């Protein structure tokens, strides 16, 4: 975690890393300058919800698309 503090993320990005750390999530999956803070947010929420974030772990997918995928994964899990 301390190494990520030195990696010059903007405040909004680092906030998502910090929240993942506090929640006990594997924030290393999204702690990359390649992701916007909004994308990091959707990945963090997916990890928290225990959905397969690898499906949308791609910085070319917009945060809004990530949200749609995450919600669909949540919905399909509840149907099973």
Q: How would you describe each model-predicted region?
A:
Residues 1-80:
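General marker for long, soluble alpha-helical cores
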